Amino acid sequence: MSGAYRQDLNWLVSDFTARVPDVAHAAVISADGVPLSLSDGIPPYFAEQLAAITSGLASLMQGAARIFEAGLPTQGLVEMEGGLMIIKAISDGSSLCVLAAPDCDTELVAYEMSVLVEAAGEVLSPALRGASPGGMTPPSMGGRRPPISPLQGAAAKTAAPPSRW
């Protein structure tokens, strides 16, 4: 993975996670699985995994929409026991991915995602990848990676931590 994400745009998604209740992490991912911007607290190795999963799910959503002749997909939701993964299309195949607590207000989260995409869609477009500085290198741990609780950030912002993450 090239790891060419826009560190100077991370504040957009970090601000989103700070403002929206029960949201732990957010990332903007290109169609080809490259993290374009990341919220605070996402380790590099987790960003790579999240990017691959997000681009894969976005591709599946696009394939389903094509087969069912249902127009372009705008949003997808993966509901798990320990939390939600919400994916929203931005432009040119890029996506905003949000990890939230299982009992979050999904309507509020989806609304805030739409506001972010509308307000910052051009800024977050994949065309900026070519100008991206630096890269990410996963930590060296002898082949092991520490477990991450994807929603640990949500627990710090809410009175009661999410049920599982």
Regions found by a protein language model. Name each.
Residues 1-23, 32-165:
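Acidic, low-complexity cytosolic segments
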